[in-house]
Swiss-Prot record:
Mg(2+) binds at residues 246, 291, 318. The active site is at residues 209, 343. Component of the RNA degradosome, a multiprotein complex involved in RNA processing and mRNA degradation. Belongs to the enolase family. (2R)-2-phosphoglycerate binds at residues 167, 343, 372-373, 394. This is Enolase. Binds a second Mg(2+) ion via substrate during catalysis.
Length: 434
């Protein structure tokens, strides 16, 4: 009843108005899986290859018709009549068919859409939700947890058209007793921030990930405004709420000058100076998690930063690790960072993603499941976070349905599983001494 009968790829639109792929997998018995894939703005150089048409007369070269054709022909005929429940076989068949290290023949966007749609179809054929099927793929059946959210309330960098250098300013509702409560707290602070910005005569337009995107004189001004917004609620910064930032430092790094250029502030830092700057911020504000605090290729800089800050703060590798198990192993061996950001489309299949999560957890690295700046209504990452008991999730702000769809899915899952079957550990999941 789980044999693949048909695979259909189609070109749809993502949250930035760019084309992306949606895939439908039909199994015998009438079971169907539907999945769509995201796309990043600030991408790591070592991510797998996203196949685009490069036809400048159509979608400014970003069309995915070639990828859709590959799904409907090459991939379909390689997977036809296969057992959808055997996710490893499905993914490995596509990896072998592609034959490259970075999936540049078929495109990781083609492969991932089929991988996720197949998993959803298989879950349907087994009469279970996706998170339960993922737990079984993970060889941890029945083991679930609800993640602590990093809620992005101010967007900067490549995610917004403003002058803020740091790409994401996030809040973590650490006093919450459930994901549902954490989401409510996040929404209340999001609205408090919006009202405060209005009172200051500042813009309340939002960036790619749904956070506010005004101009600020400095990163510290952004942090001060967040601090004020929290104070205007019943919550206490440092007690109920902690902060997290994504520097996306690779986007700030000038390779010619070998400096990190904070253009919005009119200053620049060496590798070590950037670490000292981030240390100063974390001493002044309750920042407990810093993502990509160095350029993706600056392993020495990351090692220094880990030695300086790693005992007290969660240091997250995104562009550094790109959800690649081999790069993560290198980081573990060198003692670089203490957490990893997981993005399905950085590596391109569900099984490879799960394998990377397993390695991270084995070596006590924090795991944060993440969206991309160009998203769809697909909620697979919510199920992935619960089904692998990853502990943390980063899926944007409290606006834009491409972001809130994931939060709403987590609310539904928590309602089904309740706290006994899927505990919410909150702050315990963060690799910091806070």
């Amino acid at each position: 009843m789980s044999k693949i009968l048909k695979i259909i790829g189609r070109e749809i639109i993502d949250s930035r108005g760019n084309p992306t792929i949606e895939c439908e997998v039909l199994l015998e018995g009438g079971f169907v899986g539907l999945a769509s894939v995201p796309s990043g703005a600030s991408t790591g150089s070592f991510e797998t290859w996203e196949l685009r048409d490069q036809d400048k007369n159509r979608f400014m070269g970003k069309g995915v018709q070639k990828a859709v054709e590959i799904i409907n022909n090459k991939i379909f005929y390689s997977l036809k009549n296969k057992n959808a429940i055997d996710q490893f076989d499905i993914d490995q068949t596509m990896i072998n068919l592609d034959g490259t290290e970075n999936k540049s023949n078929l495109g990781s966007n083609s492969i991932l859409s089929v991988s996720l749609a197949t998993a959803k179809a298989a879950a349907s054929s087994k009469g279970m939700p996706l998170y339960q099927h993922i737990a079984e793929i993970n060889n941890t059946p029945g083991v679930f947890s609800m993640p602590l959210p990093m809620i992005n309330i101010i967007n900067g960098g490549k995610h917004a058209n403003n002058n803020i250098d740091i790409q994401e300013f996030m809040i973590q509702p650490i006093s919450a007793k459930s994901i549902t409560e954490a989401i409510r707290i996040g929404a209340e602070i999001f609205h408090s921030l919006g009202n405060l910005l209005k009172d200051k005569g500042m813009s309340t337009t939002v960036g790619d990930e749904g956070g506010y995107a005004p101009n600020f004189k400095s990163n510290e001004e952004a942090l001060n405004v967040i601090q004020d917004a929290v104070h205007k609620t019943k919550y206490k910064l440092g007690k109920d709420i902690t902060l997290a930032i994504d520097c996306a430092a690779s986007e700030l790094y000038n390779k010619t000058r070998k400096k990190y250029q904070f253009i919005g502030e009119g200053t620049e830092f060496s590798s070590q100076e950037l670490t000292h700057y981030l240390k100063k911020l974390s001493n002044k504000y309750p920042i407990i998690s810093i993502e990509d605090g160095q350029d993706e290729s600056d392993w020495e800089g990351f090692l220094y930063q880990t030695k300086e800050l790693g005992n007290s703060l969660q240091l997250v590798g995104d562009d550094l690790f790109v959800t690649n198990k081999n790069i993560l192993k290198k980081g573990i061996k060198k003692g670089v960072a203490n957490a990893i950001l997981i993005k399905l489309n950085q590596i391109g299949t569900l099984t490879e993603t799960i394998e990377t999560i397993k390695i991270a957890k084995k070596f006590n690295y924090g795991v944060i499941i993440s969206h991309r700046s160009g998203e769809t209504e697909d909620t697979s990452i919510a199920d992935l976070s619960v089904g692998t008991a990853s502990g943390q999730i980063k899926t944007g702000s409290m606006s834009r349905s491409d972001r809130t769809s994931k939060y709403n899915q987590l609310i539904r899952i928590e309602e089904i599983l309740n706290k006994k079957r899927a505990p919410f550990y909150g702050l315990k999941e963060v690799k910091s001494s806070f």
